[in-house]
């Protein structure tokens, strides 16, 4: 049974709950459900970048926008410095959020095989699928978050077989009673199974 967290029950100076992860791990859907459960605004960093003119160019080869990170930081700061409201912030650039404003950072992880299927269904190009699968195997989003915030603020959740509502409910519980951070290591698992080379390019 889900427990509702009232935004008035927290005396906090940190205003942001972050949801990050490789494309395809479920960030946007989980953030929307969590925002609804907590009755707080959800900020998509991708949309924020577009709205503030922070997409400086387009990388045609990688089929993605190039983000002006300084511009995006300037757009983020006024949002998180408003201590009167709590936010859920999701996206691929959560490490740009000032650490002092972060309550918790949740990194969504997905088994590389499941991630490949999801990105294929989305119509991603083969090169972009491989790039994102490699990033997931290597734990790039995990490492970026740990580098940006204190390790005890960073939690990982396996979304391979878990629906967005269930992930949001788990995050809600972890906000109330934070467990010891769990680290998901696809590299170790794949290496143990003798499959790591199948997922990484030279």
Where are the language model's segments positioned?
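NTP-dependent small-molecule kinase module
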Residues: 146-202
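Hydrophobic positions on the alpha1 helix immediately C-terminal to the Walker A/P-loop
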Residues: 30
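ATP-dependent small-molecule kinase phosphotransfer cores
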Residues: 41-97, 190-195
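Conserved lysine of the Walker
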Residues: 27
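Pre-Walker A (Motif I) flank of P-loop NTPase domains
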Residues: 14-16
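A glycine- and Lys/Arg-enriched "phosphate-lid" helix/loop adjacent to the NTP-binding pocket
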Residues: 57, 109-153
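Hydrophobic anchor at the beta1->P-loop junction of P-loop NTPases
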Residues: 19
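P-loop (Walker A) phosphate-binding loop of NTP-binding proteins
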Residues: 22
């Amino acid at each position: 049974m889900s427990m509702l967290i009232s935004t008035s029950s927290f005396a906090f100076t940190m205003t942001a709950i972050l949801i990050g992860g490789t494309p395809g791990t479920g960030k946007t859907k989980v953030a929307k459900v969590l925002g609804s459960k907590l009755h707080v605004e959800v900020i998509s960093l991708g949309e924020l970048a577009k709205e503030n003119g922070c997409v400086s160019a387009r990388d045609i080869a990688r089929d993605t926008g190039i983000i002006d990170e300084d511009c995006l930081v300037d757009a983020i700061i006024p949002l998180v410095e408003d201590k009167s409201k709590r936010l859920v912030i999701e996206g691929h650039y959560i490490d740009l959020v000032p650490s002092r404003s972060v309550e918790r950072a949740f990194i969504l992880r997905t088994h590389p095989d499941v991630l490949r299927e999801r990105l294929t269904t989305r119509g991603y190009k083969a090169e972009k699928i491989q790039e994102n699968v490699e990033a997931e195997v290597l734990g790039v989003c995990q490492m970026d978050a740990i580098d940006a915030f204190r390790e005890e603020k960073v939690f990982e959740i396996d979304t391979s077989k878990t629906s967005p509502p269930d992930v949001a409910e788990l995050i809600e519980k972890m906000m109330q009673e934070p467990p010891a951070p769990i680290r998901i290591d696809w590299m170790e698992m794949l290496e143990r199974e003798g499959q790591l080379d199948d997922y990484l390019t030279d």
